[in-house]
Regions:
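Generic hydrophobic/packing signal
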Residues: 27-31, 49, 67, 85, ...
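Conserved catalytic-core segment of NTP-binding enzymes
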Residues: 1-82
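Charged/polar, solvent-exposed surface patches and flexible loops
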Residues: 66-74, 95, 117-120, 140
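Noncatalytic linker/hinge segments flanking ATPase motor cores
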Residues: 34-42, 58-66, 89-99, 124-133
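NTP-binding/hydrolysis catalytic cores, primarily Walker-type P-loop NTPases
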Residues: 98-145
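Short amphipathic alpha-helix initiation/capping segments at coil-to-helix junctions
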Residues: 61, 77, 86, 108-111
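Beta-strand-loop-alpha "switch" segments that mediate conformational coupling across diverse proteins
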Residues: 55-56, 72-103, 115
Length: 145
C-alpha cells in the first residue's frame, strides 16, 4: 500500500514525532498499539514526544496526567516519553471555537502560551505569533476585506 509506505518513510525520516494523546483509556490503548508497532519495526523511540490535548481535572475524567505518563513509557528507557505540550480543555476554547474567534491571538491566554511552547519546540526557537491587522469599523460592518 503506497499510503502506508509513505507514512512509514515519513516517520523514519522525521527528526521528531509528536503523538497527540488525551486522558482517555481507549485513546491511550490505540496510542500504545501505535507505539508497540513502531518499536517492533525498530523505530528510534527517542524521537517520540507527547502532546496532551484537552486536559481536564482528574476528578472529572477519572484519569490524571500521572496515569497518562505511566501508561505511555518508552520501552528502551522504561521512562515516560517527553511531554512537549499540555493543552487544557476550557470553556474559553470552546466558546472561541464556536464563535470562530482565534483564541491564539490573545497573547496572555493560557491556551496561547501552550501553543507557543509547542511551536517553539517544533521549530526550535522562540515563536511569536503576529497579531492580525484590525479592520476598521466600516470594514467590519460591511464585510469588506
Amino acid at each position: 500500500n503506497n499510503t502506508r509506505d509513505s507514512s512509514y518513510m515519513a516517520l523514519m525520516e522525521a527528526d521528531q514525532v509528536f503523538l497527540v494523546v488525551t486522558q482517555n483509556f481507549n485513546t491511550m490503548n490505540c496510542n500504545n498499539s501505535v507505539l508497540s508497532t513502531l518499536y517492533k519495526v525498530k523505530f528510534d523511540m527517542s524521537k517520540i514526544n507527547l502532546i496532551v490535548n484537552k486536559i481536564k481535572p482528574k476528578k472529572s475524567v477519572g484519569i490524571g496526567m500521572d496515569e497518562v505518563a505511566e501508561a505511555l513509557k518508552n520501552p528502551d528507557t522504561g521512562r515516560p516519553y517527553p511531554c512537549v505540550a499540555k493543552i487544557k480543555d476550557t470553556n474559553d476554547i470552546k466558546q472561541a471555537n464556536n464563535n470562530a474567534e482565534p483564541l491564539v491571538y490573545n497573547p496572555s491566554h493560557e491556551f496561547t502560551k501552550s501553543i507557543g511552547q509547542l511551536v517553539s519546540k517544533i521549530v526550535g526557537d522562540d515563536f511569536v505569533l503576529e497579531q492580525p491587522k484590525k479592520k476598521s469599523f466600516l470594514a467590519r460592518l460591511f464585510g469588506s476585506k
